[in-house]
């Protein structure tokens, strides 16, 4: 019962962040699928890639996997599992990875104030588009923004590199009433003039970006 609750909680978080899930939590067992952000690690015995969740549970792929993209701390992983087995395996759980896991891009955390000038507003952003991973370890965002109207699938990766997300705090001030304020800034790089922003008309929401909150917390006075 305790393990079932753990899976259901993961599904609830997944729904809030727009992550897909399909869980069979019936008492007779069954299978389920889930897409979830994990920390990427390696098995101390085999050296193979494994995944770790917020509670330090380890997820062991049944076959060797390679994570695509630029290496970072977190990856988005789609997997299936046997429910009865999953519920009894303790803190090391067997999973069947579906597709190729992808590293999440890491956003910059800055101690310098970033003025609003030169930044762009985000569309459709709310608290349901974010997730605190672990005990204030990482902040994961799923923002909606606009890419250039000429963007096609072949040029998407290049276009996305021009969209920069920065989380900043004012290192020169102390927390007010013991509350640390973090602010998000969104910039589109390599735009010649402000008028050129009118050409950014294609909405894009299939992007996840994470920030390492630990660095900000450690540095804050």
Q: Where does each model-flagged region fall?
A:
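First exposed extracellular module after export/assembly in secreted or surface-exposed proteins
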Residues: 32-221
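Bacterial Sec-dependent N-terminal signal peptides
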Residues: 1-6, 10-42
């Amino acid at each position: 019962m305790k393990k079932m609750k753990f899976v259901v909680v993961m599904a609830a978080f997944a729904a809030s962040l727009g992550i897909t899930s399909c869980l069979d939590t019936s008492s007779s067992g069954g299978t389920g699928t889930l897409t979830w952000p994990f920390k990427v690690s390696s098995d101390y015995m085999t050296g193979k890639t494994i995944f770790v969740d917020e509670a330090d549970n380890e997820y062991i792929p049944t076959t060797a996997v390679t994570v695509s993209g630029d290496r970072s701390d977190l990856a988005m992983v789609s997997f299936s599992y046997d429910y009865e087995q999953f519920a009894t395996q303790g803190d090391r759980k067997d999973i069947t990875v579906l597709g190729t896991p992808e590293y999440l891009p890491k956003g910059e955390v800055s101690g310098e104030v970033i003025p609003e000038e030169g930044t762009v507003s985000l569309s459709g952003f709310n608290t349901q588009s974010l997730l605190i991973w672990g005990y204030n370890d990482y902040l994961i965002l799923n923002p909606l923004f606009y890419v250039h109207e000429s963007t096609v699938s072949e040029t998407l990766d290049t276009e996305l590199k021009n969209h920069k997300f920065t989380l900043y705090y004012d290192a020169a001030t102390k927390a007010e009433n013991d509350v640390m304020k973090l602010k998000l800034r969104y910039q589109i790089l390599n735009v010649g003039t402000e008028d050129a922003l009118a050409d950014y008309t294609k909405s894009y929401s299939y992007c996840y970006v994470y920030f390492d909150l630990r660095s900000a917390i450690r540095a804050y006075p």
